[in-house]
């Protein structure tokens, strides 16, 4: 066997084994060491990250990809299911990034969750979550991908509902689970179609055999699956609701794991989509609508975690637009750069929330650049990277995506919406920085502000370096897998930067207007629409349920109580008794006085006649 594929396969299988080992040790019936979370889980993830750099280096040097099939799970006459790993461009680049980000999040969680009595179980859940995501990324067939897909789904349910004593956390966990179930219907139906028509779930065979079939139906199922998992418009409300979970969960969920799983599914299977115009147009329009709607919702939110959550959904919409433009490698590049600064934004938010006695309202913050200088600086860096500031990580992916949009002849409506959403990104990002870092403190004076802890500083510092240089490193070392779009005039090339600058100025104007009151009732309809999330949760979660409840009450009262129960109960008994009484009364008319009078008169007459 050639040494290069051997190095790739053995290294990445070793990574998976190292990650599984702490989970297996937790099955030991003996009581665990209180330090198990940091000694086993964090060490395992950091070691796995270092090992995963070896196959990445080999791939960058040799350009070699490999597939490992090492176990036949099930064989029938027409159908085989194998355990098969695909170590290609996507899995070799994504795995180290996921491990690096998770390592930082786990270290931060050791500080954030130190007082939780079940911290070891929490770390085990986070590790299982990561294993499920790596299983999904490295899968070479739909069955194995489905295992990873369901794994991240069930672990997200357990982690979002971690504080299960709170009704909101339970509701959010159920909401995430139910919305993902809707998406899972699409994936299961697509897998059933592939099994019936192509007789294979192996990805290479699907690519080869799909040329002879119209793939519109399974592609719609895959897009539905991605809509549920990656929180696209229509199935998006679970994403902001998931903020009820602990902040490390939000960071892991929104950066490099669950929410990008749907986009990754479409990237992995893009070969069967690239010539299907209906599927591409669906992705383009769905992504544009998601990006604009969620960015508009983020403009007026006051919960710092909700704003970052809506920004995630907006960026996922941008990735979906990129897939619709037939540029999956740009969507993957944005996944990679987005992981660093989004995880860092959540960790900075967690540090601020912890320091302000669990306060999440940005209107009650302010002046933190003096009290939490490191966290505030990293929050600003992350926000700048998110808006696509030149030479930070987000610039290399967002600029390439906007350039591809500007040179595209596709749907101008969708591309215009996406550009507007990009400008909104600058508005809400700068709004967060303004309210959190600038101005004077608006929080209680007795807040236990302290960021001088290595478990806080080190993970945020690592992610800050990633947010600054990751885009440059990835674009410098990895050649595009598809031919890039052609160049454009400098004026058009500057369009992305101009849109971001306009967004920043708009944010400054909005921030200064916040302290000025021009109307007695300043809340406008547009503000209300944005603040109420477009009335989407109210309509979906309340309107239909209220109609069903009203219909049920009418059926229960009018049909059951007033009809069947009345007929079988009091009214039924009375009608039966009335009939019997009528039959009885026909034989005896009830004129007793008349009868007695006639009887007495007859008796008197008879007596009189007898005496004569």
Curated annotation (Swiss-Prot):
Query: Which keywords appear in this protein's UniProt record, sorted alphabetically?
Result: Electron transport, Membrane, Mitochondrion, Mitochondrion inner membrane, NAD, Respiratory chain, Translocase, Transmembrane, Transmembrane helix, Transport, Ubiquinone
User: Which GO terms of the cellular component aspect does the record hold?
Assistant: mitochondrial inner membrane
**One GO MF term:** NADH dehydrogenase (ubiquinone) activity
Entry membrane topology: Multi-pass membrane protein
Q: Which GO terms describe its biological process?
A: ATP synthesis coupled electron transport; electron transport coupled proton transport
Query: What EC identifiers does the entry list?
Result: 7.1.1.2
Report the superkingdom from the record. Eukaryota
Q: Which reaction does it catalyse?
A: a ubiquinone + NADH + 5 H(+)(in) = a ubiquinol + NAD(+) + 4 H(+)(out)
General function of this protein: Core subunit of the mitochondrial membrane respiratory chain NADH dehydrogenase (Complex I) that is believed to belong to the minimal assembly required for catalysis. Complex I functions in the transfer of electrons from NADH to the respiratory chain. The immediate electron acceptor for the enzyme is believed to be ubiquinone.
Q: Which family does it belong to?
A: Belongs to the complex I subunit 5 family.
Q: What is this protein called?
A: NADH-ubiquinone oxidoreductase chain 5
Q: Which organism is it from?
A: Formosania lacustris
């Amino acid at each position: 066997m050639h040494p290069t594929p051997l190095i790739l396969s053995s290294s990445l299988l070793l990574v998976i084994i190292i990650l599984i080992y702490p989970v297996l040790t937790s099955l030991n019936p003996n009581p665990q060491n209180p330090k198990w979370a940091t000694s086993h889980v964090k060490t395992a993830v950091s070691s796995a990250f270092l090992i995963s750099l070896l196959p990445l280096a080999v791939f960058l040097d040799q350009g070699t990809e490999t597939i490992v099939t090492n176990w036949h799970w099930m064989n029938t006459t027409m159908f085989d299911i194998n355990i098969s790993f695909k170590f290609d461009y996507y899995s070799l680049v994504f795995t180290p990034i996921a491990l690096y980000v998770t390592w930082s999040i786990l270290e931060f969680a050791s500080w954030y969750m130190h007082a939780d009595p079940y911290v070891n179980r929490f770390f085990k859940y986070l590790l299982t979550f990561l294993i499920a995501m790596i299983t999904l990324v490295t899968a070479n067939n739909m069955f194995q991908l489905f295992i990873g897909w369901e794994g991240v789904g069930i672990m997200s349910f357990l982690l979002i509902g971690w504080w299960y004593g709170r009704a909101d956390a339970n509701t959010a966990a159920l909401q995430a689970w139910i919305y993902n179930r809707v998406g899972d219907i699409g994936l299961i139906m697509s897998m059933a179609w592939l099994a019936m028509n192509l007789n294979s779930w192996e990805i290479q065979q699907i690519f080869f055999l799909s040329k002879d079939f119209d793939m519109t139906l399974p592609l719609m199922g895959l897009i539905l699956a991605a809509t549920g998992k990656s929180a696209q418009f229509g199935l998006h409300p679970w994403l902001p609701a998931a903020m009820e979970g602990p902040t490390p969960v939000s960071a892991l969920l929104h950066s490099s794991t669950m929410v990008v799983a749907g986009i990754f599914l479409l990237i992995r299977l893009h070969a069967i989509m690239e010539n299907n115009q209906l599927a591409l147009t669906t992705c383009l329009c769905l992504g544009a609508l998601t990006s604009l709607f969620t960015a508009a919702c983020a403009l007026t939110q006051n919960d710092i975690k909700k704003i970052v959550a809506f920004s995630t959904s907006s960026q996922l919409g941008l990735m979906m637009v990129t897939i619709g433009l037939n540029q999956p490698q740009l969507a993957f590049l944005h996944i990679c750069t987005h992981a660093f600064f989004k995880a860092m934004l959540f960790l900075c938010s967690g540090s601020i929330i912890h320091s302000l006695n669990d306060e999440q309202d940005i209107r009650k913050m302010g002046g933190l650049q003096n009290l939490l200088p490191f966290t505030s600086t990293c929050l600003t860096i992350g926000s700048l990277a998110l808006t696509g500031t030149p030479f930070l990580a987000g610039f290399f992916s967002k600029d390439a995506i906007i350039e591809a949009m500007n040179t595209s002849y596709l749907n101008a409506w969708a591309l215009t919406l996406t550009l507007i959403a990009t400008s909104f990104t600058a508005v809400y990002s700068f709004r967060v920085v303004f309210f959190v870092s600038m101005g004077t403190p608006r929080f209680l004076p007795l807040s236990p502000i302290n960021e001088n802890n290595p478990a806080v500083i080190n993970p945020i510092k690592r992610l800050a370096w990633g947010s600054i240089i990751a885009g440059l490193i990835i674009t410098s070392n990895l050649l595009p897998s598809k031919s890039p779009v052609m160049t454009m005039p400098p004026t058009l090339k500057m369009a992305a930067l101009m849109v971001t600058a306009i967004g920043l100025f708009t944010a400054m104007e909005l921030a200064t207007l916040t302290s000025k009151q021009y109307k007695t009732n300043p809340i406008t309809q547009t503000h209300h629409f944005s603040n109420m999330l477009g009335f989407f949760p109210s309509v979906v979660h309340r309107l239909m349920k209220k109609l069903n409840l009203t219909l049920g009450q009418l059926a229960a009262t009018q049909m059951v109580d007033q009809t069947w129960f009345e007929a079988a109960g009091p009214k039924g008994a009375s009608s039966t008794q009335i009939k019997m009484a009528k039959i009885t009364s026909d034989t005896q008319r009830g004129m007793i006085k008349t009868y007695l009078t006639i009887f007495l008169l007859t008796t008197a007459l008879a007596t009189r006649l007898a005496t004569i």
